Amino acid sequence: MTLSLDATQLDRYSRHIIMDEVGPEGQGRLLSSRVVVVGAGGLGAPAIQYLAAVGVGELVVVDDDVVERSNLQRQVVHCDDDVGTPKAESAAAFVRGLNPDVSVEPVEARVDKSNVHEVVAGSDVVVDASDNFPTRYLLNDVCRFEGIPLVHGAIYKFEGQATTLVPDGPCYRCLFPEAPEPGTVPDCATTGVLGVLPGTVGCIQATEAMKLLLDEGEALDGRLLFYDAMDMTFETVPYRTNPDCPVCGEGGVDSIEDIDYVESCAISLD
């Protein structure tokens, strides 16, 4: 079902509506959509900003952290007055000020096995803007089992990556069969991150989400996009479904209940 647009919306979204790939029907589809963004930090901030601006009707923003001053160099939905405020609520307040068409739900929690089904329920797309491997594997697994497209992004210093995981394509475990050992991957507090880098990658994630919602263009399904800000290069590397994947391969599991996302994210099929 798509929504009819009133005069104010026809004006607000006029630059979309004039394009054949969107039009009034596509804009109505965006306004009828529900997107969950997990993480309201570096990647989540630009994704939230643009998904709200383009008129995604329902946004769920999930984050258990609070705004710190060191976040403000890159997390563009938060400002100095938000320091100490839960990121989910700060991002939600930004959305409310940006676009009254968007109903935004802040969820001040870390996604885990106990709440992930409730978090993603009813969503058309999930955007993974998290910063840790247990959450990435958890979102991959539950979205695969629930049949929900998932847009992944990650950043490191001057480099970023993104891919889109659709229900009938390869999953995150096909791409990265094993998570790194805990503590072996440094975070941005240790290595630093170029302030504009998450903006680029987060906007790519928002673009992928929009394409999925509009059913237009070619998604990054089965392709991992690499971005190097220092060389200003983009490269895509194809990947395929792993027939032995424990989630999407033959004979794989069909539930997250027996998977330990705290220790290793590994799945035993024995």
Curated annotation (Swiss-Prot):
ATP binds at G42, D63, S70, N71, L72, Q73, R74, K87, D131, N132. Zn(2+) binds at C171, C174, C245, C248. One of its GO terms (molecular function) is nucleotidyltransferase activity. The keyword Zinc applies. Pfam families: ThiF. Gene3D superfamilies: NAD(P)-binding Rossmann-like Domain. It catalyses: [small archaeal modifier protein]-C-terminal Gly-Gly + ATP + H(+) = [small archaeal modifier protein]-C-terminal Gly-Gly-AMP + diphosphate. Disruption phenotype: Cells lacking this gene are deficient in sampylation, i.e. SAMP-protein conjugates. Moreover, they do not grow anaerobically with DMSO and do not show DMSO reductase activity, but their growth in the presence of oxygen is not affected; however, they are retarded in aerobic growth at 50 degrees Celsius. The lysine tRNAs of the mutant strain appear to be nonthiolated. GO terms for cellular component: cytosol. There is a cross-link at K113 (Glycyl lysine isopeptide (Lys-Gly) (interchain with G-Cter in SAMP2)). Its EC number is 2.7.7.-. Binds 1 zinc ion per subunit. Interacts with NcsA. Belongs to the HesA/MoeB/ThiF family. This is SAMP-activating enzyme E1. It comes from Haloferax volcanii (strain ATCC 29605 / DSM 3757 / JCM 8879 / NBRC 14742 / NCIMB 2012 / VKM B-1768 / DS2).
